[in-house]
């Protein structure tokens, strides 16, 4: 299912070679964004796509998303263009086919569960309550750690900055000798505090995923007696739900890590500036310390205010996804786009599998040749025989 999409993924992975700085998630994100934009209005997009400079589009796309890590090997664009043009012609048809398959699967589940509507509602309600109870400690812990670590950072750095300001006044005639050790120690303290912040605040994504798995397994067992004859379809739908919920866990970790990196990026130049000003005059150093002290308070408070709600927002998002799943199984589900989660799940699995193959076979200095569409399936089969067997894309 959606083989052409998978092949494009493999090709784009091959473009980057096996450079260590390019991860499978980065590649999958770029490819998935590309597919999503194209499939929003597939027919119109395909027609427009074939009229424009495909090479420039993809080059710009990868440059924006991956930066220097996406530098292409010479001549790769010429191989990519015919591949993508052929792919685009099949995209709309493939997407619609998968959409219909998932729609039929949901209809079969609704028909089977309809006589037990009250029990289904009760089961979901109980499961949502348990999910909230299981997730609450993570949100509380994240909030506590944010408050503790940001407060500790200020307690470590603010008094030290004030000590440096006092030392300046007492050592005007011997500024460099007296202040250089303090400035170096300030930088060490700052770096150490940032590392501790990362260590304590990075959410435990694997633990969150395990909680999600356990919660959904409990739900599956509770619904099993109500889905006799269609349990495989229920299992399949819940795989898609699990993928989306776990994706939220990964995104939470990414967001928190990004905020920590941004805080460090904002404050590090100010710390460096203090060191550089030690070689200058008293007035310049004093101003640099004042700027750092002021920005430390502002930036840390902004960080705390932004990150603190993320745990609770994550919990609400998971409960909402569970509620949306319940509605999909109900009589008034309306139009849904649940097929997209299956396409994305399969796409990412394919990227991960192929990246693993490249790491085992390829060299960072020797990018893999780009397969054309008609060659892709044969090449994938050859690779599978060499230890890695990618899973077939699911429908």
From Swiss-Prot:
UniProt-annotated stretches for the region 13 X 22 AA approximate tandem repeats: 33-330
Keywords on record: Chylomicron, HDL, Lipid transport, Repeat, Secreted, Signal, Transport
Organism: Mus musculus
Start and stop residues of the Sequence repeats: 33-54, 60-81, 82-103, 115-136, 137-158, 159-180, 181-202, 203-224, 225-246, 247-268, 269-286, 287-308, 309-330
SUBUNIT field: Homodimer.
Taxonomic path: Eukaryota, Metazoa, Chordata, Craniata, Vertebrata
Gene Ontology terms for molecular function: antioxidant activity; cholesterol transfer activity; copper ion binding; phosphatidylcholine binding; phosphatidylcholine-sterol O-acyltransferase activator activity; protein homodimerization activity
UniProt name for this protein: Apolipoprotein A-IV
Role this protein plays: May have a role in chylomicrons and VLDL secretion and catabolism. Required for efficient activation of lipoprotein lipase by ApoC-II; potent activator of LCAT. Apoa-IV is a major component of HDL and chylomicrons.
Any one cellular-component term (Gene Ontology): chylomicron
Highest taxon, organism lineage: Eukaryota
GO-annotated biological processes: cholesterol efflux; cholesterol homeostasis; cholesterol metabolic process; high-density lipoprotein particle remodeling; hydrogen peroxide catabolic process; innate immune response in mucosa; leukocyte cell-cell adhesion; lipid catabolic process
Domains: entry comment: Nine of the thirteen 22-amino acid tandem repeats (each 22-mer is actually a tandem array of two, A and B, related 11-mers) occurring in this sequence are predicted to be highly alpha-helical, and many of these helices are amphipathic. They may therefore serve as lipid-binding domains with lecithin:cholesterol acyltransferase (LCAT) activating abilities.
Leader peptide range in chain numbering: 1-20
Biased composition annotated in UniProt, kind: Low complexity: 366-395
Stretches of the chain forming a coiled coil according to its record: none
Keyword Repeat: yes
Main location: secreted
